[in-house]
């Protein structure tokens, strides 16, 4: 079964996230566990945690289908010692919040070398940061998100992802979330079933398909290899509808959280419906009614 959802709002408290997901017909969801634009936030209240867990249960959302995302402020490969220390502490705090919610994964962007250190040194810092967080926590898997390769951000190539994983000591608690827009912008073609198969085969050869824990489903505003992270609605960008048909029909992607981060949140319910139709049959025109 495919588990499609979206990155939903936590306005009013994290306990509202599963309610928002249910409203749009999601079978998975992503969320921030705090204000992602602040380094520190109040601890999660016991009542919020209890209500979150109950709402997840009522909505049929299991921990393996929920993908928390850390703050965009965090840079686990920062070349600046004070910012690296702050990022590591914030990342561990996010791990603790995820554990308290009873969840199993924390999705994060690898990091940026800021043109101050060599990329290999930055990758080592990222792996070291992950090791430190895993050592101080007990059950959350650190899920690395591939990037578009914009600016000095690392994690565009499968080689980058493999390098980080190779240096993570507990291989049972590290994984990857593949973002389709980032893949495409980073030079990995997924526009047809054959192209998707080739890209997944390459991922398996270099990283290992066993590490694939989730996907972000986004079309792309920019062409293949642009290195620009510009999301578009499903079927309306440069990737196209055939790619998402192939994803929705690919058996290796069953039971993974498939999370929309497309720009029109008001259209998520419609996009989720479209994706589930794609799972059943070839749809050439995104305007085709159910």
UniProtKB/Swiss-Prot annotation:
| Positions that bind Zn(2+) 3 | 182, 229, 231
Which amino acid positions bind Zn(2+) 1, per UniProt? 69, 109, 145
Q: What PROSITE patterns does the record point to?
A: AP_NUCLEASE_F2_1, AP_NUCLEASE_F2_2, AP_NUCLEASE_F2_3, AP_NUCLEASE_F2_4
Family annotation (Pfam families): AP_endonuc_2 (PF01261)
* Record-level Gene Ontology MF annotations: deoxyribonuclease IV (phage-T4-induced) activity; DNA binding; DNA-(apurinic or apyrimidinic site) endonuclease activity; phosphoric diester hydrolase activity; zinc ion binding
What this protein catalyses is: Endonucleolytic cleavage to 5'-phosphooligonucleotide end-products
Domain of life, source organism: Bacteria
What this chain does, per the entry, is described as: Endonuclease IV plays a role in DNA repair. It cleaves phosphodiester bonds at apurinic or apyrimidinic (AP) sites, generating a 3'-hydroxyl group and a 5'-terminal sugar phosphate.
Q: Entry cofactor note text? A: Binds 3 Zn(2+) ions.
Gene3D superfamilies of this UniProt entry?
Divalent-metal-dependent TIM barrel enzymes (3.20.20.150)
Write the record's keywords in alphabetical order, separated by commas.
Answer: DNA damage, DNA repair, Endonuclease, Hydrolase, Metal-binding, Nuclease, Zinc
Question: Which InterPro entries does the record cross-reference, listed alphabetically?
Answer: AP_endonuc_2, AP_endonuc_F2_Zn_BS, Xyl_isomerase-like_sf, Xyl_isomerase-like_TIM-brl
EC identifiers of the protein: 3.1.21.2
The UniProt entry's sequence similarity note says: Belongs to the AP endonuclease 2 family.
Query: What protein name applies here?
Result: Probable endonuclease 4
């Amino acid at each position: 079964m495919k588990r499609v959802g979206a990155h939903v709002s936590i306005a009013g408290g994290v306990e509202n996230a599963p309610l928002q997901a249910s409203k749009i017909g999601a079978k998975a969801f992503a969320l921030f566990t705090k204000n992602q634009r602040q380094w520190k936030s109040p601890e999660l209240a016991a009542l919020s945690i209890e209500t979150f867990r109950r709402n997840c249960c009522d909505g049929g959302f299991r921990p393996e289908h929920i993908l928390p995302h850390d703050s965009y402020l965090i840079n686990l490969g920062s070349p600046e010692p004070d910012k690296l220390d702050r990022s590591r502490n914030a990342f561990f705090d996010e791990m603790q919040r995820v554990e308290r919610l009873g969840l199993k994964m924390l999705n994060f962007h690898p990091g940026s070398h800021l043109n101050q250190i060599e990329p290999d040194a930055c990758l080592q810092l990222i792996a070291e940061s992950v090791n430190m967080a895993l050592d101080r926590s007990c059950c959350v898997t650190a899920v690395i998100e591939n990037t578009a390769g914009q600016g000095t951000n690392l994690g565009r190539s499968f080689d980058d992802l493999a390098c980080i994983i190779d240096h993570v000591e507990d291989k049972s608690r590290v994984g990857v979330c593949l973002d389709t827009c980032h893949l495409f912008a980073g030079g990995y073609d997924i526009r047809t079933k054959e192209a998707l198969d080739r890209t997944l085969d390459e991922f398996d050869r270099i990283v290992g398909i066993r590490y694939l824990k989730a996907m972000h489903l986004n079309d792309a505003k920019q062409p293949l290899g642009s290195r620009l992270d510009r999301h578009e609605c499903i079927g309306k960008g440069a990737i196209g509808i055939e790619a998402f048909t192939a994803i929705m029909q690919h058996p290796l992607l069953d039971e993974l959280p498939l999370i929309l981060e497309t720009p029109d949140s008001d259209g998520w319910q419609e996009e989720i419906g479209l994706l589930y139709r794609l799972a059943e049959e070839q749809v050439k025109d995104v305007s085709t009614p159910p």
